[in-house]
Amino acid sequence: MKLRNKVSAERCSLRMLFGRMPRVLTALLLLPLLMLTGPGDAALAAAPAGAARRLEIGLAQCVEGYIAGSDAVRTAEKKAGDSAEAHKRAVAEKKAALSLAELETAAQSAQLALAEARNNAALQAVQAYAGLAQAARDAQSRHASLAVAEEKLRVLRLRHQAGLITGDTVLQQENAYLSAKDAVIRADDSLRQAKDDLCRAMAVDLYEEIVLTTDVASLADETVTYDVAECTVLARAASSSYFSAVKSEELAGQKYEALQDPMIAAKAERASAEEALRDAAEKLSNAEKSLNDSVANALTQLDSLIRSLRMQVLSAQLADANLDVARIKFGYGEMLQYELDSEVNSVDQAHVRVTKAKEDLYVQVLKIESMIGRNVADVLCRAGLK
């Protein structure tokens, strides 16, 4: 009964709304204002208390903020510093050669892990930045779809009053309108959450309005290529886990060789060293396989994203052609306004998918650059981003 009353109330509000004869064109013209500011007064009312007003930020700035605010980076920095200090002290105290080698390996591995932590934070920033742009576009698209559904419902109600269609058709469109309205609410909520997450990750105040000054999609290059063998070599040199596995196997081998003389090592000690060598060799083999798989998967994903981008471009071109035909039909009176608006919205969504495909492609390129040891922040600087 409560649900039936709720639906009846909603339909009553719809009748009041359609009595005002809303214009779809006005709604569509206002949609760009929603891109990153949310749905207007409702967004401001929902904004956290004390939230700042406006933030303009580029991709490189966002990356710097993520790195500065990353707990993982701070932890890696501390570990790298402690490892370097432990090795320095061991050298000063003239520790045994194998002990020095172990400490040196730990220090070098910690430095590689620090670079990985910084790159991981940078990648998270890029994904969050692109994700915020995508959330804004999705909210804009949902508002446009709602405006189209609203106008279609208004027209269908008029046609029903004129006896041209049945009430079931109107009810179906009312359901479609309510679904579109729910999608708008969820999209606006996702947009607010994306903005809040971005600010929190950079450890800055929450902002009601965020202006993204970098067009991530424009950075994508579908002609980019990588050589599998070259990437594998570079990835091995950059991976802290692979480096640690290699050095551990080397040290285990040296210790095993050093204990082969029965005059200086007991049988149990030699057996333990042999077992340690086998374990180290197995870990190295697993690390090598894991790294090779990661490189292969990353490059396969890159190829897939390039193909997806090309497909989305073709789909957008087809949508453009369909819109041209729809405008001709509308000009000849063969199509209603809401039908033309629906075609326009379909074209906009097709181009939004192209933009998202480009952003996804660029993010994947940065993941590969990070994997092969490139500094993501430096890559962005070389791209001219500030």
Identify the role of each PLM range.
Residues D188-E230, L366-K386:
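Short, solvent-exposed, mixed-charge loop/turn linkers that connect secondary-structure elements
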Residues L3, A43-L59, A113, A201, ...:
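Acidic, low-complexity, intrinsically disordered peripheral segments
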Residues T26-T37:
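Bacterial N-terminal signal peptides
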Residues K2, P32, A43-Y129, L164-G167, ...:
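Bacterial Sec-pathway N-terminal export signals of envelope proteins
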Residues N5-T26:
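Bacterial N-terminal signal peptides that target proteins for export
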Residues A76, S83-L103, A117, R137-V184, ...:
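Charged, solvent-exposed structural "stalk/scaffold" segments
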Residues A84, V91, L98, Q111, ...:
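Coiled-coil heptad-register positions
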